[in-house]
Regions:
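Conserved acidic segment of CheY-like receiver
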Residues: 4-19, 23-27, 40, 55
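The feature encodes the CheY-like receiver
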Residues: 20, 62, 86, 90
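Short hydrophobic/Thr-rich beta-strand motif most characteristic of the beta2 strand and flanking loop
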Residues: 31-38, 42, 46
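Acidic catalytic/metal-coordinating carboxylates
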Residues: 38-39, 64-69
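Active-site beta3 strand of CheY-like receiver
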Residues: 50-57
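C-terminal output helix
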Residues: 90-92, 106, 110-119
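The C-terminal output helix
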Residues: 120-134
Length: 150
């Protein structure tokens, strides 16, 4: 029997410890596995693309911003659904993230019920796309082993 909740993993990346702690408390209380990171770099070093998950990320952080993290995930062809949270967002920034595939862009302080509903939708989306992603990775690995003649 697995100790990991059936609902999936929620990654939280925010440089504000209070935000990370409150999101972890809220989401673990709803049965989600939550993994928090204070920077995009620490998230990238420990992100496991083999699990059904979603990402809640602050748009503005010190070293690597949420937008830069989104771009890195796009380059890696990650299927990870993303929602951006911010205390200082603007319309062009929100539009940019959505055009690049973010599922939502919400302002702090956020409505807890809205956020939990959004996490549920993101994880449903992740479950739907996860099998396709794994198949794509397996196919690419097999194709890379072929010689030019094959």
């Amino acid at each position: 029997m697995s100790l990991i909740p059936k609902k999936g993993t929620v990654y939280v990346v925010d440089d504000d410890e209070a935000v990370r702690d409150s999101l972890q408390w809220l989401l673990e209380g709803k049965g989600y596995r939550v993994r928090c990171f204070e920077s995009a770099e620490s998230f990238l070093s420990r992100y496991d693309a083999r699990e059904v998950a979603c990402l809640i990320v602050d748009i503005r952080m010190a070293a690597m911003t949420g937008l830069e993290l989104q771009n890195r995930l796009i380059e890696a062809r990650s299927p990870l659904p993303i929602v951006f949270i911010t205390g200082h967002g603007d319309v062009p920034m929100a539009v940019d993230t959505m055009k690049k595939g973010a599922m939502d862009f919400i302002q702090k302080p956020f409505n807890e019920e809205q956020l939990v509903g959004l996490v549920e939708r993101m994880l449903d989306h992740a479950k739907d796309t996860f099998a396709d992603y794994q198949l794509s990775v397996s196919r690419d690995a097999l194709l890379s082993k072929l010689t030019l003649r094959e």
